[in-house]
Curated annotation (Swiss-Prot):
Organism: Synechocystis sp. (strain ATCC 27184 / PCC 6803 / Kazusa)
Any one Gene Ontology cellular component term annotated for this protein: cytoplasm
Taxonomic path: Bacteria, Bacillati, Cyanobacteriota, Cyanophyceae, Synechococcales
GO annotation (BP), single: reductive pentose-phosphate cycle
The protein's name in its UniProt record: Phosphoribulokinase
Gene name linked to the record: prk
One Gene Ontology molecular-function label: ATP binding
EC annotation from Swiss-Prot or TrEMBL: 2.7.1.19
Result for mutant: S222Y: In a light-sensitive mutant with reduced activity
Catalytic activity entry: D-ribulose 5-phosphate + ATP = D-ribulose 1,5-bisphosphate + ADP + H(+)
UniProt keyword terms in alphabetical order: ATP-binding, Calvin cycle, Kinase, Nucleotide-binding, Photosynthesis, Transferase
CDD domains: PRK (cd02026)
The UniProt record lists the keyword Transferase: yes
Family: Belongs to the phosphoribulokinase family.
């Protein structure tokens, strides 16, 4: 845990349910260590329980179902190095349980639907990430999961997605513009793939963020199309395509990195890593090592895993620079 003299670094991880937040948080824990990182699920700040939302005719995505005043006050208190009595939302019962004491830590992650929604909370966040699954991929994933595992019909699944869509569009999706990085999961362009078994993943990196320099492929600021398949990277049809270049995203100047396709042999990932710069690694092959450490994590064999690890490494770099800055005495 931390003391009031330490710099608490606050990370925001935003996105809809089923977008990969849990896997990303596991990768962050691998980097920072469980003892140094506290994760707060912002569902705990629901002001209405499940029955209350049903009676009021609102979803959990609607700001009216959430207590942003309490969220702001408690996150501000944690960031100042003091403990809080955090409410608990019970996902099994749908009820609000008695609060629990939460101590500050070196890294505090707030994750959920709204970490970048409220301007007051957003101003407290040192680094913000938005995990963005395209509607086409989201539908395909949900169909595969819910039809196979839960026995839902195709019509039920589409109805569930469409019921959430207006609130998602109004309250969740706009947070992308405030994130320092966005990880987008999109349909492949390599072949026609109606089941989304192959993915095109983009890392959108905002320019001009304090202590954050976008990673790049080969030559910073250039536009690069690269097919790394060959003697040093094993690929089966339809292969892998990578892209890097400058762009504009929701009014922000950004650098894009993109991976379309699947990596066949993770041990060979070091070849790709070797051509990426400003990754935040501390030694040669660290990114590949982190991917190999948890081959079982979803997305490890495509751009999802690669960019989640890369963003985690960049967060570690931001953390180190923020804490170093806090230790420098102010000039008289």
């Amino acid at each position: 845990m931390t003391t009031q003299l330490d710099r608490v670094v606050l990370i925001g991880v935003a996105g809809d349910s089923g977008c990969g937040k849990s896997t990303f948080l596991r990768r962050l824990t691998d980097l920072f260590g469980e003892e140094f990182m506290t994760v707060i699920c912002l569902d705990d700040y629901h002001s209405l329980d499940r029955q209350g939302r049903k009676a009021a005719g609102v979803t959990a995505l609607d700001p009216r179902a959430n207590n942003f005043d309490l969220m702001y006050e408690q996150i501000k208190t944690l960031k100042s190095g003091q403990s809080i009595m955090k409410p608990i939302y019970n996902h099994e019962t749908g009820l609000l349980d008695p609060p629990e004491k939460v101590e500050p830590n070196k890294v505090v992650v707030i994750e959920g639907l709204h970490p970048l929604y409220d301007e007051r909370v957003r101003e407290l966040v040192d680094f913000g990430v938005y995990l963005d699954i395209s509607e086409e991929v989201k539908i395909n994933w949900k169909i595969q999961r819910d039809m196979a595992e839960r026995g839902h019909t195709y019509e039920d699944i589409l109805a569930s997605i469409n019921a959430r869509k207006p609130d998602f569009t109004a309250y969740i999706e706009p947070q992308k513009q405030y994130a320092d990085v966005v990880i987008q999961v999109l349909p492949t362009r390599l072949i026609e793939d109606k089941e989304s078994k192959l993915l095109r993943v983009r890392l959108v990196q905002k320019e001009g963020v304090k202590f954050f320099e976008p990673a790049y492929l080969f030559d910073e600021g250039s536009t690069i199309d690269w097919r790394p398949c060959g003697r040093k990277l094993t690929c089966t049809y339809p292969g892998i395509k990578m892209y890097y270049g400058p762009d504009n995203f929701m009014g922000n100047e950004v650098s894009l990195l993109e991976v379309d396709g699947r990596f066949e042999n993770l041990e060979e990932m070091v070849y790709v890593e070797n051509h990426l710069s400003k990754t935040g690694t501390k030694y040669y092959g660290e990114m590949t090592e982190l991917l190999l450490k948890h081959k079982d994590y979803p997305g490890t064999d495509n751009g999802t895993g690669l960019f989640q690890v890369l963003v985690g490494l960049k967060m570690r770099k931001v953390y180190e620079q923020l804490t170093a800055e806090a230790k420098v005495p102010a000039s008289v």
